[in-house]
């Protein structure tokens, strides 16, 4: 699995040393459907947080999206007019270490604010200690008030990290750089430079496999 994600090779081109490609793909598909990849990913994330002397349940998250191209043979897609990309969007929520808390894959035409509601609902259901979510200006508007209503008697807020209108070129923004770094980690895996998967759940699984590999390397260095 790591070889496919890191090298970007097609399943049928998997070296014979790894066994029949049908067997490997069958395992990947089965683990995608029964949430095994999610379980492994989340377990490793908890271990990494502990090694960094963090509590398992985060109190803060950062959300953002990334539009990626989809080859002609792949499935569902849309057109992101802002980025001028025909493909899909990866919506991520990460903790302050850049580790993924939640993933959502949509056609690229879906607005960030619309997808964010589903992503934030997942965060709220999984992480009861969550207090603040940081996002960029693309999430500004009614979403801020909507987040407050999710926990009317609790402390949960959406904070928009604004970019100065007078700033030209690239500038590192507080908090937002964390999720951008996570997207950079994903880009190092050739399989994730575009979205080659027909099924959306397979797209999510590929992202989790990439992060599993990175977290295993991180834990190995810490041991």
Give the residues covered by each predicted segment.
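Short alpha-helical elements
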Residues: 1-223
């Amino acid at each position: 699995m790591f070889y496919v994600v890191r090298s970007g090779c097609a399943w049928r081109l998997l070296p014979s040393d790894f066994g029949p490609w049908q067997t490997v793909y069958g395992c990947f598909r089965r683990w995608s459907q029964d949430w095994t990849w999610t379980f492994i990913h989340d377990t490793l994330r908890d271990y990494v947080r502990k090694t960094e002397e963090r509590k398992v349940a985060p109190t803060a998250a950062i959300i953002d999206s990334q539009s990626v191209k989809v080859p002609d043979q792949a499935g569902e897609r849309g057109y992101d007019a802002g980025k001028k990309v025909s493909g899909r969007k990866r919506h991520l929520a990460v903790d302050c270490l850049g580790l993924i808390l939640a993933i959502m894959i949509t056609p690229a035409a879906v607005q960030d604010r619309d997808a964010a509601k589903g992503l934030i609902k997942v965060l709220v259901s999984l992480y009861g200690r969550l207090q603040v979510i940081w996002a960029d200006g693309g999430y500004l508007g009614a979403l801020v008030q909507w987040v407050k209503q999710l926990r009317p008697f609790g402390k949960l807020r959406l904070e928009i990290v604004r970019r100065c209108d007078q700033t030209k070129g690239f500038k590192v923004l507080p908090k937002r750089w964390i999720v951008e770094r996570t997207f950079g980690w994903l880009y190092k895996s050739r399989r994730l430079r575009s979205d080659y998967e027909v099924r959306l759940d397979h797209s999510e699984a590929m992202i989790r496999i990439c992060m599993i590999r990175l977290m295993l390397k991180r834990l190995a260095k810490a041991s």
